Each structure stands twice: as C-alpha cells, then as structure tokens.
A protein has these predicted regions:
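Cyclophilin-like peptidyl-prolyl cis-trans isomerases
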Residues: 1-209
Length: 209
C-alpha cells in the first residue's frame, strides 16, 4: 500500500499529540506521588504549635491558607525538633521577641534553604501575630521567627515596602509572650538585646486535638 506524504504528516501529528498527553499525565502523577517538599495545605491547615519555653508555653495557630510555604517551612523545623534548646535572642519591649536561630552560647544553628517571602498575603503584623525574621534580602527567611508585642504596621507589606510575612497568631500564652517581652536585656557579643537570663525554647510541637 502506498502512503503519501499527507498521510505520513497526519500520522506524525497524531503520535506527537498522544505523546504530549502522556507527558502531561506523567507530570500530574509525579506531583501527586511526590507531594509538596515542604508539606501541603491539607497537612497544616488549622494547626496549633506549642512553643514550650523556660517561662511558660505559647500556643500559635498557623495560617496555611494565607501563607502556605511559610507555614510548611515552620512546621518542617518544628517536626525535626530544630527549635529545641534555641533561645529568644532578641527581645525589644514594645516591639517584638525573636528566636529560633541560636543556642544559649550564641552559636547559630544550621538551617535549611531560605524560602520566598509571602508578606503580600493580607495578614498584618498585629499584636500577638507570629512572622518570619529575615535579613535585608526579602527571600532570606529560614528558621528565625518573631512575635509582635504590639501592632507593628511598619512591618506590613505595601507597594513600597516588602514587609515581613505573618503566618499565624498566638491563641494561648499571651501573658508568657508579654513576660518574655519585659525581661532585662544586655549586649552580648554581637547581640544588643540578648536577655540577661536566657529564655530557652525547650520544645516546639504540634498540639494534639
């Protein structure tokens, strides 16, 4: 049987079309099997993390809907016990308390790769909210977080300000947050606002329902 040029082209187009469909199906299956590297929204939605400190417990409700990557990143550190024996190394009354990156000696802990900034998520740096700390590079947040002691509007995202990504709020332990925020601080090495008596994070874990 003679196969003309048009038939060959038509068959080629059909084969390429089927090949494209197979690749698309393969990509979808890969995503479903692999999952999200930093967790999924279903895993972290409505999650409460207990931050156990030497001054009491702080319970934080995470907002995975508004800040999915930031929340999943935080949970990765929680689940790996990364925060155990870290301290609140920066305490500024009337501003915020910051921790999650250093141990009591001032030695930094080795972190995972930084994440992209999710500050443009509609959440504000209000009193009692938790947000990711970072350097001047917007996409540099790793493990360090801070809790706002007051409404800090200047930390919010605007068209001219990258801001800081809020990903949850304190639901229990506001008095502990306030107590930590009122401890005496001093300069310790490179740190200007280090508590005179270390406020240690004994553990951070998921609250059981």
């Amino acid at each position: 049987m003679k196969i003309n040029k048009k038939t060959v082209i038509a068959l080629f187009m059909i084969v390429m079309f089927l090949f494209t469909i197979l690749i698309s199906i393969g990509d979808v299956l890969e995503v479903l099997l692999r999952g999200n590297k930093r967790g999924t929204i279903e895993e972290v939605e409505e999650t409460i993390v207990v931050i156990e400190t030497t001054m009491g417990n702080i319970e934080v409700k995470l907002n995975a809907v508004s800040a999915p990557e930031t929340t999943a990143n935080f949970l990765d550190y929680v689940k790996s016990d990364f925060y155990v024996d870290t301290v609140f190394h920066r305490v500024i009354p009337g501003f915020m308390i910051q921790g999650g990156g250093f141990i009591a000696t001032g030695k930094p802990k080795i972190t995972e790769d930084p994440i992209e900034l999710e500050s443009n998520n509609g959440l504000k740096n209000l009193r009692g909210t938790i947000a990711m700390a970072r350097t001047s590079d917007p996409n540099s947040a790793t493990s360090q977080f801070f809790i706002n002691l007051v409404d800090n509007e200047f930390l919010d995202y605007t068209s001219t300000n990258e801001g800081y990504a809020v990903f949850g709020e304190v639901v229990e332990g506001m008095e502990v947050m306030e107590a930590i925020g009122n401890v005496k601080t001093a300069t310790s090495g490179l740190f200007e606002d280090w508590p005179e008596k270390n406020v240690v994070i004994l553990g951070a874990y998921l609250k059981e329902n």
